[in-house]
Every structure is written in C-alpha cells, then in structure tokens.
Amino acid sequence: MIDRYKHQQLRIGSVSPQQISAWANKILPNGEIVGEVTKPYTFHYKTNKPEKDGLFCERIFGPIKSGICACGNYRVIRNEKEDQKFCEQCGVEFVDSRIRRYQMGYIKLACPVTHVWYLKRLPSYIANLLDKPLKELEGLVYCDFSFARPIAKKPTFLRLRGSFEYEIQSWKYSIPLFFTTQCFDTFRNREISTGAGAIREQLADLDLRIIIDYSSVEWKELGEEGPTGNEWEDRKVGRRKDFLVRRVELAKHFIRTNIEPEWMVLCLLPVLPPELRPIIQIDGGKLMSSDINELYRRVIYRNNTLIDLLTTSRSTPGELVMCQEKLVQEAVDTLLDNGIRGQPMRDGHNKVYKSFSDVIEGKEGRFRETMLGKRVDYSGRSVIVVGPSLSLHRCGLPREIAIELFQIFVIRGLIRQHLASNIGVAKSKIREKEPIVWEILHEVMQGHPVLLNRAPTLHRLGIQAFQPILVEGRAICLHPLVCKGFNADFDGDQMAVHVPLSLEAQAEARLLMFSHMNLLSPAIGDPISVPTQDMLIGLYVLTSGNRRGICANRYNPCNRRNYQNKRIDGNNDKYTKEPLFSNSYDALGAYRQKRIHLDSPLWLRWQLDQRAITSREAPIEVHYESLGTYHEIYEHYLIVRNIKKEILCIYIRTTVGHISLYREIEEAIQGFCQACSDGI
C-alpha cells in the first residue's frame, strides 16, 4: 500500500469476501472467471506441469516461464496493452513469471469458518464484541451445541418436541436422525443455528455505535457505585470495567477502519501466491514442498467432501454434515495457526507442520528476518567488550572481521602497489596473512569509518560511526561512555558492524554519526555520554580509599593487609606508618614499584590555601622533632611548623586512586582550554 506521501506501507487487517475475490479473479476472453482453487493437486506426476484449478494452476497464478503458456506457446511480453493477452487453448495469461509472487487465489468454503486469530487469541475479539464467554463460543463454533432461532407465531419442530433448552446436547443425537441432508439443512436454517454461521449472524446483527453507548453507560454506573467493601466483588467490578473499556476501544477501531465485524468469519479463504510456498526439486529427483501446501490440500479435501455431502448425497444424516463442518473448521485453524487448539498436526516423520502463523511470526518469521532484518553485504557481528584505552570516537575491530569487511580495498591496494598481479594472487596473499596485508589494511582503515548498530534500534543513537583500529581476539572493543546511547552492557551483548561504501554515506558518518558528535540525548537534551555501570564501579574502587580513617589506622592495627611492609617493627601494638611524598610523581612511582597499593593512605605535599585551615579544629596528634619543628596531624591534612610556629609545608591525606583521577581530570581541563585558545 502507498499513502498520499508515496510512502510504502503494510497494513494487516480483516478484508471483505468481495476484496478477496477481487484479488484473485481474472476474466478470460471467453467470459470465464478464474481464481478459485477447487482441486487439492499440485503437479502432474508424469508431465511435472501444474494441475488445472490446483494449488499451482497457471491459469490462476500466472505462467511458470515468462511469456510461455501451459500449451508451450511463446509470446513476446510488451509494455503496451494489447487486446489478446491470454492463450485461447489453455487460458494462461502472457505475462512475466514474477506475477506468481503476488497473484493470489481463493477457496470458496462450503460453510462459514471463524478466523482462529480473532477467536482463540487473547483477548478474543469475537468474545469481546458479543460479550459472551470464550468457552461458550468455542462450543458453538465446533458444533458441540446450538441455540434456537426466535420464530414468533409459527409452529416449529422444536415446539412440538417441547422446550429446547440452551446448551443441551440432546438435539445432537436425536434431531438429526429424523432428517436427510436437505431436510436437515432446511430445518437448521429455519429453527436452529450452529457453527461459524451462527457467529457470523450475531456479528452481522451488531450495531457498533449502540455497543459503544451501552458500554459507556454501564461503565459509568459501575464507577458511581463505588467500593462495596468485599474484595472479591470489587475485583469482579474492576475486571468488568476493564472489559468494557476494551470493548469500546475495539468497536471504535472497527468504525474508524471501516471493517465489518462479520469479516472475522471467513466465507472465502485466500490462497497464497505459489512462489511464497514453493515446491523445489532436490538431488535424486525428490521434491521438497512447503508445509503450507499440505495444509491447503487438507482444507480442500475436507471442503470438497462437505460440498459433496450438501449437493450430491440426499440420504446423508444431518449429524454427519455437522461433523464434516467441524473438520473443515479444524483444517482452516491448522492452516492459520497449527497447535492453537492443543495438539499440533504432524507429518509422517512426527514433525510439526509450519502454519501461516509460524511463517510470519517470531525472530525467524517473514517480517523480522526478511523485511526488517535483512542480511546485507559488508557487515559482521560479534560480542562487545570494554576498551578502556580507546578514544571516544574509536572502536576495536578483530583482525578476522576487519580483513573480511575491507577485503576489496586491500585487494585494490595490493594491485596498485604492484604487490599482486591480479585478484586471485591478492586473495592468496590475504589467505596466507602476509605482513604487507596488515600494513595495507591499517592504511585503509585509517580513512574509512564504520557503523556500529545494536538491535533493537529504538532511537537515533542506536547506530553510530567510529574510526576502527585493529585489535587482537574475536570481540569488538567499545568505549564504555557510548554504552548508554546503545543501551548496551558488557555481559554478552552483540553488535553489528557495517561499512559505508558511497561517498555520501561516508560523509554522513563523519559529519553526523560519529560518537563524539552525539554527546547529548536527541530526546531530552541531557548528556548521554556519561559514566555508567562498569565505569561507576571503577571510579568507586579507584577513590574509595581506606574506610578505617586515620584514628582507626593508628589505634586499631588488626587489619594490616596493605601495610605489612610499612610497619615500624613486628609489634602489633604499633600503628602502620603512612608514607610522605613531595609530589604526585613520586607517589605514582611507588605504586608502580608495588611499594604501596591503590587504596593505601599516604601524605602528599600540597599547595593549600592557609585560610582553609584557620579553623578551631584541634589536631589529633602533635609530633615534635629535635630541631624544634613539629607536625600537627589532623584528620585530612598535616601541617609542618617551625619553632616560630610558622607553616613550612602542608600535606594532605589521600590515596593513589585519588591522585590518578585528579591528574586525568586536570589533563582533560588543560586540553579543553588549549583547544579553546587555539580556536578549535
């Protein structure tokens, strides 16, 4: 379907029997209308040609070979319209064979059949509209019971036999025995109603606007009553109100889309185009057929049997007719959704048949696999792992993936540099993984961005561009700051990588899709490249330090895991001495030499504003030295004074983790200021 803006769209919904026949019917030059599939056959076993009026009939679905009819006559296919488009002998149209991908047929059902999606799927649309229990409707559809038609002021057979109580099954074994096929059909059409035809009659009698009005009034009355105090009654009222809301919404949808409720009961069953349910010949002359063909054959067999019972046989009991109608209903249910009513239908090898629902639903269905998630060239997929050393706009590609994605560019580079005479020699060098191959691949990747995509792509940041670099292993390395935009984490998530080929695509990737160009959320404008999950845990571990504090370290020296090499002696009554460093380089050097740990407390000489320490806080300890200088030890800093009480230097109590974080932030700020001063 194409809307007024020329956008291709797909709409799934109910259609009228007239629309189904319009999809399939074709008028031949002799006035014959073709489109109905009446035979359950596919190909003739001798000629291997499609059977006439069968599931692969060329008159209904078009020729197998373009411009060649079933007789073997050939005619050139032209664009201009001509009067004679059909073969006079076989009635096959001279068109392109691709018509068999979209030309449909139909099966004219001998009795109405409910669409199992609208009956059995929850919520049941038919049960909602009719306001009846689903179990009751199922019994009516599958001919387990019936109900009497209201016939006023007329003598009826049911009145002669007494009161006919609703849902009593005695009629099933007594009434049909008194009638032949035609008489029972007349009796049933006049006095009782059963099967899908009864559902269709009730749906056709519905007035959707009256349903909306009555449901709205009932909902208001239930709301005005208020809670009763009985929990069970209140829940019952709540469920009823929810049901009324769903019923009103469903009725409004039918009115808005111009769909009639009785269309949920089928009189014509559409037949899919042959190319969507093919029969393929494999090695050894064996044939492989789609399961849908077998399910269609089952429907046609049972439908033809019912037609014979209704037209040719005049002495068939009415009970047998109803049993055959039930079989037709079950065959259509299996075709549409195998197993929805319990045990699924299986073939001779105990394999479950794939119904129409199985073909289109799920991850491997028609929509998600071939329409929404098509496999494309120049793409790959792998697990993502964290790359903490990467820049924000870079990603790490495994060598195995990179050499496949950029293979044509590497081949071109080898030929241009006269390292390979042709494509075959270049491919052999790539297979042998010669060192020159990796050098050329590195040059190619420097000027070629890639696109990373994580499904489901729910917003614009679900696919971003990166500058690839080669990494070891088989996983894609990703900067942790871009995880929030992808809604990704490193617990086994997979991402797809695509190579933009055209200049327009590469320009779009560089100017609009690079990760460092998408730092804000397109929805609310908040920063989206923020630390999450692993980064937050790492920052916490980096800056957590020693929770015991300076007092606990001095007066509770039980835990000496990190400070065994700094004890003054082996006496457990003495505290761990915290080292002093004149600058951050010495502290980091001691950490690299494993003389201290990441969370080891230490004293670092610092240029601290003296006004910040002129408080009334009393020192925890004061250490005096022989030359008159002394150390005032506070909880977070240490002051060294001379004999005149002048401040010589100040130390702050910190850890190597705090120092590393501060240096990274300081370098980032300096780089930003330098970039601003240079006008970048």
Swiss-Prot record:
It is an enzyme of class 2 (transferase). It holds the Pfam family RNA_pol_Rpb1_2. One of its GO terms (biological process) is DNA-templated transcription. Its EC number is 2.7.7.6. Zn(2+) binds at residues 69, 71, 87, 90. It is found in: Plastid, Chloroplast. Keywords: Chloroplast, DNA-directed RNA polymerase, Magnesium, Metal-binding, Nucleotidyltransferase, Plastid, Transcription, Transferase, Zinc. GO terms for molecular function: DNA binding; DNA-directed RNA polymerase activity; magnesium ion binding; zinc ion binding. Its main location: plastid. Binds 1 Mg(2+) ion per subunit. Binds 1 Zn(2+) ion per subunit. It catalyses: RNA(n) + a ribonucleoside 5'-triphosphate = RNA(n+1) + diphosphate. GO terms for cellular component: chloroplast; DNA-directed RNA polymerase complex; mitochondrion. Signal peptide: none annotated. Its cofactor is Mg(2+); Zn(2+). Mg(2+) binds at residues 489, 491, 493. PANTHER family: DNA-DIRECTED RNA POLYMERASE, DNA-DIRECTED RNA POLYMERASE SUBUNIT BETA. Belongs to the RNA polymerase beta' chain family. RpoC1 subfamily. DNA-dependent RNA polymerase catalyzes the transcription of DNA into RNA using the four ribonucleoside triphosphates as substrates. In plastids the minimal PEP RNA polymerase catalytic core is composed of four subunits: alpha, beta, beta', and beta''. When a (nuclear-encoded) sigma factor is associated with the core the holoenzyme is formed, which can initiate transcription. This is DNA-directed RNA polymerase subunit beta'. It comes from Manihot esculenta (Cassava).
